[in-house]
Amino acid sequence: MKPIRVRIKGLNSFENEQEINFEKLTKRGLFGIFGPTGSGKTTILDSITLSLYGEVARKSSNFMNTNCNSLNVSFEFQISGKEIKRYLVEREFRRDNKTGSVRSKSAKIVDITGDEVEVLEEGAKSVNEKCQEIIGLSLDDFTRTVVLPQGKFSEFLKLEGKERRNMLERLFNLQEYGDELSFKLARKIRKEREKENVLVGELKGYENINEDVLKERRELLKENNDFFNEASKEYLKAEEEYNEGKEVWGLQIEIEEKNRVRKDLMEKKDEIDLKEKRARLGESSSKVKPYIDNYENTLKQIDILKEQILSRENTMKAISLEKEDMEKKLSIAKDNKEKALPKFMIKHHIILDAIKEKDLLDNIKLEKKRLQGKIEKLSLEASNKEELIKQNIKDIDSLTLKIQNLESKIDNLKVPEEYKNKINEGIFLLRNYDEKLKHKNKLGLDCDKFQVDFEKAKSKKEMLFNKLEEERSKLDTYTKKLQDLNKDFPKDDVLLTFQEKLNDSRQKWAKYSEYNESLKASLRVVENSEQVLRTKKEEMTKLEDKISKVNIKIESLETENMAHVLREKLKSGEACPVCGSVHHIKEGFKEVDLKALETLKSELEGFEKKRKFENEEIVMCEASIKVEEKNIKKLNESINNLGEEFKEVSLESMEKKFNYLKEKVNKFNLEKIQLDDNIKDLSERSNKIEVEYQKEKTVEKQCEKRIVDLKSELEEAIKEFNEVAYTIENLKAELKIQDFKFEMKEILEKERVRVEAEGEIKDLRNLLNIRHTEKEQLMDKCSRLKEELSKNKAELKEKDKIINEKIELIKNKVGVLDNLYELKEKIEGTIKKIEEQYNLCDKKMNEIEDKYRKCSDEIIKYHSNLSSLKDRKVNDIDKLNKILMEEKFENIEKAKENYLNDKEINLLKSDVEKYKNELSKVNGAVEVLSKKLKNRKLTEEKWIEIQNNRVEKASKAKALQERSIKLEEEVKNIEIKLKELGKLLKTKQELEHKLSLLDDLEKLFKGKKFVEFVALNQLKYISIEASKRLKEITGGNYGLEVDDNGKFIIRDYKNGGAKRDASTLSGGETFVTSLALALSLSNQIQLRGSAPLELFFLDEGFGTLDSNLLEVVMDSLEKIHSERLSVGIISHLEVIKERMPVRLIVSPAEAGVGGSKVKLEIS
């Protein structure tokens, strides 16, 4: 990575924007950054890390200048690989108004290689990741590679023992293979040991699980399933019998319900006939009603029209009188408009001209008045401005004096940076002292805590062991009891076989009783049905006679009625359609009574319905007799099929024997279940106790191991604590102070006062600039005011001249100067009055003529409508008489009496239709139900017996099914546990293998042997590279090697390649050797990156070197730079500054003037 350009604003001591051009700075390969202590030299390096990684290398969070609320950095750099790429990173930070902390506002990285700029990433986190991806180094690696900090050159060369190993671990980033890996490994081993203990506890829970137990349970399950299948068949048979009985019982109840409904319907017949007649008359009346309504409506409209015609004729007379009066008024108004109006219009025009002139005059007077006021105001304002200018000059002198006093105060408050650094070092040591003390105390407390935990675990382990032995003893006792119980238990098949015999005997006795009862009931039904059938047939014969007589009467009356209708329709001269005669005699014939005919028809309809009902009853009785006869035959056959064997054995003695066996089996099952539950409960408790025991055993071992480790750490902590305490006392003696914090507080107070003073100077300078600007503005305004005053006075004279001219002109036109608007309004009022009078009369005349014309048209229209209505009245009467005759109403009143609306008619018809439908449905339902019943019959006692038998069979099947489910669950659980046991054994084997590997690793990484091995190999490569550089710098005089223990050995080629210890080197020799080693180390760290770093900074304290040694160092530095590597030196020494071909001078911040500034100098 090659830097191109850096811009800084608001970072540490840099307040205003400063730009550093690295292309010019690195042109000669060697350059220096110079400036006094605290000027901001290192801040330039911070700006690069802040741009690339979003933070400074010194890990400070308060890096924004105190006088700024925003911070901007941008860094342009180049990557020189196969293809040269250029990038620009820009970041902006803001200060939080509430907390005062610095927060990132924006960040972006762009590719500026070509003509088109491409934004690669935006946002702080994304930009951080992109920069690390491009360069290939983290922040820590970058700072170790680019900068060699002060005081670190010779440290790496001379360190030995633990400090050397720790430094190597940090430099090569091997922490993850040292303590971190050891801690991870210890945690992993502890975790796996815990898993092993838990696994051992879990395996204890599978002691009674094996293939023999599984086989035994499967045999029991098979035996129980066979019993269950037999019981299921018996239950299915009982279920079929129950379903058939349920159907028959339901059908019997439904037939009884339908017969009751049919009887209720027959009682409502007369009421329904009356409703049917009312509906028929209502429909006829509804047909006549529209004609009646039309006729009555026509009469009403005729009366209304007559009244309207009379009203309009009276209105016509009044309008005629009003028209004559308005014609006279219109004539007078027209005369005024044509003669007087033109004169008034001329006068109005002259007055308007005068008013315009008067308005111009008034405006000019107002302008004059405004100018007079403005002249007075300008005079006063000019005087005030001159006074302000004098006051402003006094303020400027006062502010200048205050700034000079504050600058003197700031100089007195400055504290040397070296002193401040040593105080900071003391505070850091004090903080470290507190941390070491806390760590030491914590280790002591942890050691005590683990000792208590160890004692607790040991005590609990012993208690759990005793408890476990007790539980195992109980488990053995219960297991023996269960084995003894299984030996004495009778087999299940004995009870089941006896139960089958008992059930068979019960069923036969029940069926025998049922068949006898059904046989008796069927015989009774046949006898009753035959008696009813005889009665019904006698009633049917009588009903047939009645129907025959009524039919004869109806035929006679209908014949007479037809002859009467024919006679009525015949006209004189027309041929009779029956006899052909043209002479018709109508007198002497008696009119047929239609009401009597309707009564006979209604009576016949009733007889017909009754006959139909009686027929249905006879058919049902005959069907019932046939069904019962078949049932009697079937019952006799069923009784014979039962046989005589079941009567030989007493049902009561069989039931007693069965109950005894059943009680014995139930007692055994209860005891066995209780023992199984006790054994299961004890096994689970034993397993839990075993797991707890193993857990406490592990805790005891871990606590014991941890106590040993903590004691070792405590000894190390005490040693480190004593070292820090000694260092603090030495530093206090050197600085001759007792309290670092109090001294730092004093320094910070001085800094705070200095910052406040600087802020005050800044405010005063700003105010001084404002006062200078105000003075210039006031002088400029005062000059402009005087010019405007002169201009306004000349304008005032011109206004006086124009006013006099306008007054003379108005008097010539009108004669007066005042009251012009009143005169104008008076003339306008007269003109308006004449015009309004004429317009009003003309408008009223038009309105009267419109009213007269409309009234005349309405009278003509009403007469025409009256004539049409009279014609319609005659037509409506004819139609009404015709429909009354067709619907057989004597007059309008009769039709109105029988009128019903559609809703009432529909309601009556609906009731009739509903009745007929219900009767038809009931008859049909009875017929369908009889067919479904198929002559079957069921008594209530028999139905109850069927239900009880079904419940008993179901209960037996359910009990056997539940036992099967329980046994299946046990088999399934044993199978699952066998699989789990297999997995646990496999896991145990894998865990033992893993623990073996972890133990080997623990031995390998013990005492950081692996870290030393890796670091030593890295160090050998670095020493080879460092030896080459050292030979180049020293002209082949010295070389560098590493022995088997990782210690650096110097080869002195001036003395035949003799080996020398690093401690024997002089100051200059140590410096050049350390420099060569540091450069090689930097290259090694760079190998991790994806881009070569072409810049190297030495932030080294050269002040301790004498002139000869400094010459050697500078010669060395001039040799190591090249085209691909630029070397920068950060220093404040003038001797080094004179040797540098390119120099970047950093000027420190000045209170009240601005922040640090940079300047490039080239020799």
Swiss-Prot record:
Residues 197-415, 446-1003 form a coiled coil. ATP binds at residues 35-42. GO terms for molecular function: ATP binding; ATP hydrolysis activity; endonuclease activity; exonuclease activity. It comes from Clostridium acetobutylicum (strain ATCC 824 / DSM 792 / JCM 1419 / IAM 19013 / LMG 5710 / NBRC 13948 / NRRL B-527 / VKM B-1787 / 2291 / W). One of its GO terms (biological process) is double-strand break repair. This is Nuclease SbcCD subunit C. Heterodimer of SbcC and SbcD. It comes from the Bacteria. SbcCD cleaves DNA hairpin structures. These structures can inhibit DNA replication and are intermediates in certain DNA recombination reactions. The complex acts as a 3'->5' double strand exonuclease that can open hairpins. It also has a 5' single-strand endonuclease activity. Belongs to the SMC family. SbcC subfamily. Pfam families: AAA_23 (PF13476), SbcC_Walker_B (PF13558). Keywords: ATP-binding, Coiled coil, DNA recombination, DNA replication, Endonuclease, Exonuclease, Hydrolase, Nuclease, Nucleotide-binding. InterPro entries: P-loop_NTPase, Rad50/SbcC_AAA.
